Amino acid sequence: MCDNKKPTVKEIAELCLKKFESLPKTGKPTANQWTILAGIVEFNRNTEACQLVSLGCGTKCIGESKLCPNGLILNDSHAEVLARRGFLRFLYQELKQDRIFHWNSTLSTYDMDEHVEFHFLSTQTPCGDACILEEEQPAARAKRQRLDEDSEMVYTGAKLISDLSDDPMLQTPGALRTKPGRGERTLSMSCSDKIARWNVIGVQGALLDVLISKPIYFSSLNFCCDDAQLESLERAIFKRFDCRTFKHTRFQPQRPQINIDPGIRFEFSQRSDWQPSPNGLIWSQVPEELRPYEISVNGKRQGVTKKKMKTSQAALAISKYKLFLTFLELVKFNPKLSEMFDQQLSDPERIAYASCKDLARDYQFAWREIKEKYFLQWTKKPHELLDFNPMSNK
């Protein structure tokens, strides 16, 4: 039970940390390794019940040359993104039941229980704009800061996306960035930018948006770390777009409650003398037979033999390919949905992933407008990465 009809940072963190502690030791950081933990908690305002529904740990991304055209490899394995993708697994499972989703026969879609909300937590400030503390002097805002103990400015390693400067490490507040890293540059946007996107268009993504009546937003964003700054978090997630108009009936920019509690400790938080763990961890609130807990290495499932590395057996349950199959399976075996999508999905084995995403017309229209108004410099991945179908990996 959560007090005051809203879960506190401490209550949310307790659910996340207890679940992490209960998971098998395999895949977790070893001695002198650190990682980031992120989780999503469901809260019912009517019953005041809280439950953890998704957990992710990770710090890695793959470079542009390693992007997979068949949807088998995760591009982005930062904790925030893993937790969100694990959340998608949970939502698909819930659509098979009659607990938080209910069929709306008038709209031919699913409504989510109005008493249910979701709260996000991370043990570290999201990479990108949220890590930058704006300086008082405007002329100095874009000054290059060194990564040393004397720097008074919170530093992000996320790389600036701009045609106006040759220096991708300029600490410019409010700018779009790709993920940090010393290797090949990635096309994955920073976690600050992704959370800002979810704050406008929802966390459900295009495929799930086809099935539900309203986008799903986080009611609160919670951070338990020493370096989190409320001003920077608010700017990164919604304030940097305050001056830009966006008119859409279904999707609206949110102003979620942002909470910080530096007193909560995660045993594997980042330390300067430790190395980042190479593994990603994902847990979802789904039945045991569906394998709720997985370990990722380089965007693939740990333990897969070299012979099967390029097959669907290497794909995590939260990969594009596996979530696509989950979507198609849900539609196929749900009489209401199969009737509704009878024409569009007449040949489900050969329909392209991109074609299914395009079924979410409202979502795609809004996303195009959002990119024009908010995220003009959002990276573009090759379209052929979305052309796979269920038969691509068989």
From Swiss-Prot:
EC number: 3.5.4.34
Alphabetical keyword list: Hydrolase, Metal-binding, tRNA processing, Zinc
Cofactor: 1D-myo-inositol hexakisphosphate
Domain A to I editase: 54-388
Membrane-traversing stretches: none
Biological process, per Gene Ontology: adenosine to inosine editing; RNA processing; tRNA modification; tRNA processing
Pfam family, one: A_deamin
Gene Ontology cellular component list: cytoplasm; nucleolus
Chain sites annotated for binding 1D-myo-inositol hexakisphosphate: 84-85, 194, 197, 320, 357, 381
Family: Belongs to the ADAT1 family.
PANTHER family: TRNA-SPECIFIC ADENOSINE DEAMINASE 1
Full protein name: tRNA-specific adenosine deaminase 1
Organism of derivation: Drosophila melanogaster
